[in-house]
Each structure stands twice: as structure tokens, then as C-alpha cells.
Amino acid sequence: MKSPVELNQYFKYWEITKDLIDQCIDIMLNLRQSGHPGGSRSKVHGMLTTLLSGAMRWDIREPGKRFADRFVLVAGHDNPMVYSTLAVLNEALRIKYNQTGEKRYLNYKGQEHQLVWEDLLTLRRKGGLPGHAEMAGKTLFFKFNTGPSGHGSPPAAGEALALKLAGVGDVKVFAFEGEGGLTTGATHETLNSAWGLGLDNLVYYVDWNDYGIDSRPFSSIVHGSPDDLFTQKGWHVEGCDNNEDWKKFTQAYYDLLVTNHQKLVPKMIYAKSRKGRGYYVYDEKSHGVPHKRNSELFWKTKLDFTDKYSVQFHDFGAPEAESWGDQVKQAIFYFT
């Protein structure tokens, strides 16, 4: 992994990429009127820091690469964040290929395995992108099929153990989850097993936003905090109090994987966030309910983007179209 000093020059580009991903999440869910905006938005900084800092070794052109690190979305219902991230990064590759004609920008398995923004129009529709994480087709980036909170914890540890037993313990498994998923029994068993098995190639990222689907914050009903839990289980823990601070976030990752690296000890990094960041509906209210299609709140999230980058959305402020076909056309205009 590169040091925060080396990465500092890229933070301005990460910020732009983050904003593009946010827009993709919003437009995709605005069209489909289904999905999870709050946890998706709150994890974008963590996703980009993991993928672009060198913390995770991966190749977007070859998601099945044998010795690349693995990614498990523990709670698979936050996959709009992953879909949007892949769409933005793949669009950058598509632009570079169109500019240069160089094949190094192409997916090694062909376009049918490259998730692009057009695929976001198919969320939760037959033959389109599934509502939960599935390791197939254009979403081979996922390394396990997951759905509810905590679901991916045991598989993530199992993959880390398998890699160790195969003699490639330097291949890491990154597991993404919000702290709500830490309440499941399977997660507690995973934390115990990972420590006992010395899975230092398992890296848990916890999006610490204090809310799930209920109105009560987790801190009011669960004793202790995420860092308390992992520390008590013997894990090496690093974190930052503001996931929007790229410098502090990358420093925490660098301390975890490089400066303070511990052998045979599983790792956890946390970043405090706001569920629904930038969505104008926060905490539990943002969990699984997108804004009404083309509502005032939806357009408010677009206004932030237009003001920041001096761009305009086609028919800004327009109401939703009457037919599904015309609604899809509207979404295409918003993406382009």
C-alpha cells in the first residue's frame, strides 16, 4: 500500500469519483424505486480508499485473477454502492479505450463481463442486476453471494483460511459491513474463529454510522462500540472519526496494513460516517427507501452536484414520466 503522503496528490480525483458514484446510486434508485441508499452512500469513501490506495490488490479488468485479493460485501443489500463504483471506474476505462484503442483498457473476458452505467438501469429487474450481491457475470468482483446483515462473515473467514491453507496467505479478504451486522451470532463466531486461526489476511471494514433499519441508534441498545468488540476478540483495530477525511482514512489503513502490521492477527478498520450522507434523508430513514421518483428531494441531491461542478442535468426538476419506457429514457438523460 502507498503511504498517505504519496496518495495525497490523488485525493482530489477520489473526491470527484466519489461524487460521480453518489450520482449513480441516486439515479439508479430513483428509476427503480427500490434498494438501499443510506448504507450505500455511507460506504463510498471506504470503498474508494480500499480500492484506490493499494490496500487491496485487484484488477477491474480481470475480477477472477487467481492471486488478487478478495472482496466480500457482508451485507449484500448495499450493492448499489458496488455497482455504481464499478460503473464509474469502467466508464473511465471505456473512455480511455475509445481515445487510444489500446486493448489494455478492455475487460479480459469481454464486454459481457464489464459492468457499465447502462447496467444500472436494470437493477432488480429480470435478467438485470440482482438486488443482493451475486458472484456471477458482470459482478464477479463479489467473492460470495450475500444478502442480509452478517451473512458474509463466515464465508469471508472461510476464504481467508482456504488461502492460508493453500500457501497464499498474502492474498487478503476484505469484508465490508455496517456495525448493525455485528450483532449477528454468526459474526461473533467468525470473530472468535478468525483470531483462533490466526487469519491475518482477513481485513474487516466497518462503516460506523450507528443506525440500521430501526429508529433506535445501535449505541443505545448494544453495549460497547465496534472497536471495543473487535479489540476484545483479539483483533488489530485502527480507524478514523471522519470517513470523509481522505488523509486520516488512508493513514488508518496504512497503520493497519504497514506501520503497525501484526502477524497472525486478523484486522479491522473502521470509519465513522453518516448513514444517508448527502441524501437529505438520514439514519434509519435512509436505510431501504429511495426518494420518490423525480421528487423535490431527488432533485436537491442533483443540485449539490450541479453547483459543485457547474454542470446541468437534462430537464432539471422535471416530474417523472408516465410510462416505464419514458422513465428509463429520463434516467439515461440523467446519466449522460
Residue ranges and their predicted role:
Residues K18-S34, D207:
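N-terminal capping segment at the start of a domain
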Residues M1-E15:
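Non-catalytic, mobile gating and regulatory segments of ester bond hydrolases
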Residues E15-K18, T336:
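Non-catalytic terminal/interface segments that mediate subunit docking, oligomerization
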